[in-house]
From Swiss-Prot:
Coiled-coil parts of chain: none
Positions of disulphide bridges: none
Catalytic activity: a quinone + NADH + 5 H(+)(in) = a quinol + NAD(+) + 4 H(+)(out)
Species of origin: Cupriavidus metallidurans (strain ATCC 43123 / DSM 2839 / NBRC 102507 / CH34)
Encoding gene (name): nuoC
Methyltransferase is among the record's keywords: no
Subcellular location: Cell inner membrane
Top-rank EC class of the record's enzyme: translocase
Family: Belongs to the complex I 30 kDa subunit family.
Role of this protein: NDH-1 shuttles electrons from NADH, via FMN and iron-sulfur (Fe-S) centers, to quinones in the respiratory chain. The immediate electron acceptor for the enzyme in this species is believed to be ubiquinone. Couples the redox reaction to proton translocation (for every two electrons transferred, four hydrogen ions are translocated across the cytoplasmic membrane), and thus conserves the redox energy in a proton gradient.
Protein name: NADH-quinone oxidoreductase subunit C
Subunit text: NDH-1 is composed of 14 different subunits. Subunits NuoB, C, D, E, F, and G constitute the peripheral sector of the complex.
Length: 199
């Protein structure tokens, strides 16, 4: 893993105290930084000749509220980016936590990597993470009037409203969810009675 050791040393040298944590697992490095340092770190990751992460491949939101079966005691929302350096042929995962769990806000890195445009919109749509400085932060996958953020752990599985076609009105209508919650108990089939005949 000389390549990872080289990357780790370069990150520690260039970023210094901005490195909140650097985790090596399954042959990959994850860099964790504070929200206040996020934009500056992103620029350094892209522009420093010893790092040169030219491409942001993906960004997703994460809700850690139920992480480790509720044992997680850190901040709730994070943005996780996957970065690629074509120059040095290495990858990095960059994680930043929003400092406020009630209203998660992070700076947008769209002026560093413009490929993040729709990724930040998706994280806003699904998790409610607001990216300050994003030029067009609006929903991208849910409906215009959608209430809430469906990938949050506290969002109900059945949702709040359902959409259906009403043949009388000849249009799509929204109405409160009519699904009744039920408990599903698995049916146990004993081996001796499998298939309906006794063996």
């Amino acid at each position: 893993m000389a390549n990872l050791d080289t990357l780790k040393a370069a990150l520690e040298k260039v970023l210094g105290k901005r490195v909140q944590n650097l985790i090596e697992a399954t042959g990959e490095l994850t860099l964790i930084v504070k929200a206040a340092d996020y934009l500056e770190v992103a620029r350094l990751l892209r522009d420093d000749p010893s790092l040169r992460f030219e491409q942001l491949l993906d960004l997703c939101g994460v809700d850690y509220s139920d992480y480790a079966e509720g044992a997680w005691d850190g901040l709730r929302f994070a943005a996780v980016s996957q970065l690629l350096s074509v120059t040095h042929n290495w990858r990095l995962r960059l994680r930043v936590f929003a400092p406020d769990d009630d209203f998660p806000v992070l700076p947008s890195v769209i002026n560093v990597w413009n490929s993040v445009n729709w990724f930040e919109r998706e994280a806003f749509d699904f998790y409610g993470i607001v990216f300050e400085g994003h030029p067009d932060l609006r929903r991208i996958l849910t409906d215009y009037g959608f209430v809430g953020h469906p990938f949050r752990k506290d969002f109900p599985v059945s949702g709040y409203v359902e959409m259906r076609y009403d043949p009388e009105q000849k249009r799509v209508i929204y109405q409160p969810v009519t699904i009744e919650p039920r408990e599903v108990t698995p049916r146990v089939i004993r081996e001796e009675n499998y298939g309906g005949t006794q063996h």
